[in-house]
Amino acid sequence: MVKNKGLGRGLSSLLGEEVLPIKSEIVQIINIDKIKPNENQPRKHFEYNKIKELADSILNNGLLQPIIVDNNFQIIAGERRWRACKLAQVLEIPVIIKNFDTRESMETALIENIQRTDLTVMEEARGFKYLVDNFNYTVEKLAERLGKSRSHIANLLRLNNLPQSIQDKLNENILSMGHARCLINHEYAEEIANHIINHDLNVRQTEALVRQWHKNEYKKSTNNTNKVGKLCFKDNIIDNDLELLVKALSKKFGIKITIDNCNLGGKLMFHYKDLEELDLILSKLN
């Protein structure tokens, strides 16, 4: 039997409590239809391909690690294995029944899942929020119980304040946690998020963009038939083609030329010292 390194070691180290190895538990064979997923399970997204791979393995080798359930046959740990067994059309599976109350079940399910590398940031954040909202956990208590830093817990909890559309982009890895943190509690978070995606901004560029916003370095377009101002962000991020164009124009006219680029367009600016230089620019333009 394969030793479950993630669960056994994880519970011992994170909860500071002794966790009995599987061999000391009573394993029962239960009809798979009696087993129910935990509605408070932090993990909400299961990749079909990975479940299918696990199902194929179970068909060839059997379920090597029993699923842990509570007295109501609700899954505490092992929902991926349960889903794989369902996909493989396994009728009966080995389970270990734990006499846990709701609090213990949720804690165990959360801890079992946050040890997995494929848990999304938002799934982890929602799991933390559930414990805070339902069991009066503080950031300090969560950090102590989970073996995480207080700053990590606090930062993830704040992600729950993001609009749902941005949370979805986090789950889909369209935006990173670094991007999302810049948008927390921002009035125009969704508009800025779309700008980040459309312009492929990194976190450093996103931070600069938000700083510009707070310094009022943005404009509102008046060309909106719905009279809703469209945001125009100053990028200060010029792609290579634009940069080469500016250098070529500066060389051609012999003056300083700058470009102010934003998501709705931009401005090309000629800098002249006096009217004589302005006349020279105009003559070259003609």
From Swiss-Prot:
> Would you identify the family this protein belongs to, as annotated?
Belongs to the ParB family.
Q: What are the entry keywords?
A: Chromosome partition, DNA-binding
By its UniProt entry, which Pfam families does this protein fall under?
HTH_ParB, ParB_dimer, ParBc
Q: Which domain of life is it from?
A: Bacteria
User: What does the record give as the function of this protein?
Assistant: Involved in chromosome partition. Localize to both poles of the predivisional cell following completion of DNA replication. Binds to the DNA origin of replication.
Q: What is this protein called?
A: Probable chromosome-partitioning protein ParB
InterPro entries of this UniProt entry?
Answer: Chromosome_partition/occlusion (IPR050336), HTH_ParB/Spo0J (IPR041468), ParB/RepB/Spo0J (IPR004437), ParB/Sulfiredoxin_dom (IPR003115), ParB/Sulfiredoxin_sf (IPR036086), ParB_dimer_C (IPR057240)
**GO molecular function, a single term:** DNA binding
GO BP terms: chromosome segregation; positive regulation of sporulation resulting in formation of a cellular spore
Gene Ontology cellular-component annotations = chromosome
